[in-house]
Amino acid sequence: MNVSKYVAIFSFVFIQLISVGKVFANADEWMTTFRENIAQTRQQPEHYDLYIPAITWHARFAYDKEKTDRYNERPWGGGFGLSRWDEKGNWHGLYAMAFKDSWNKWEPIAGYGWESTWRPLADENFHLGLGFTAGVTARDNWNYIPLPVLLPLASVGYGPVTFQMTYIPGTYNNGNVYFAWMRFQF
């Protein structure tokens, strides 16, 4: 190996280490923004929201048929929340919801959600969103031990009505669930 290859490898590693330092430096800033958004949503909500679970779907490629035949995919339940739109047009929400899980047992979840929102049509009422939710849930098959969740969010909406969804990743016969609900803003 000649000297130029060593210089190239050293430069690559050095640049990566500098990048990691910047990530950690920005982590404090990101966490401060996260906490401030939660506080502002709680203290200054623009809307009160009603959540109605709509569907759970277990990805058929990731399950044995005999398992999916037994699972509940009609997650009736409900929830309430507070939300606001920020100066960039992005959505922030605090919510609590309970629904019937795959085993038809109650599963509560509460947390904070954020979506970057686009309004691609001339009609400003139509909106699309992509973001995340961070919260806590508890399941019967885990003895209702509180479990932290960090999941993706996506939505399509018109005015005060939004169809919002997430995907719970997993392994074979576990997780890999699409979950969606309606959110009505008042």
Swiss-Prot record:
The record marks 172 as: Role in the phospholipid gating. Keywords: Acyltransferase, Cell outer membrane, Membrane, Signal, Transferase. Residues 1-25 form the signal peptide. It is found in: Cell outer membrane. Transmembrane segments: none annotated. One of its GO terms (biological process) is lipid A biosynthetic process. It comes from the Bacteria. The active site is at residues 58, 101-102. One of its GO terms (molecular function) is O-palmitoyltransferase activity. NCBIfam families: PRK11045.1. Transfers a palmitate residue from the sn-1 position of a phospholipid to the N-linked hydroxymyristate on the proximal unit of lipid A or its precursors. Belongs to the lipid A palmitoyltransferase family. This is Lipid A palmitoyltransferase PagP. It comes from Escherichia coli (strain ATCC 9637 / CCM 2024 / DSM 1116 / LMG 11080 / NBRC 13500 / NCIMB 8666 / NRRL B-766 / W). The gene is pagP.
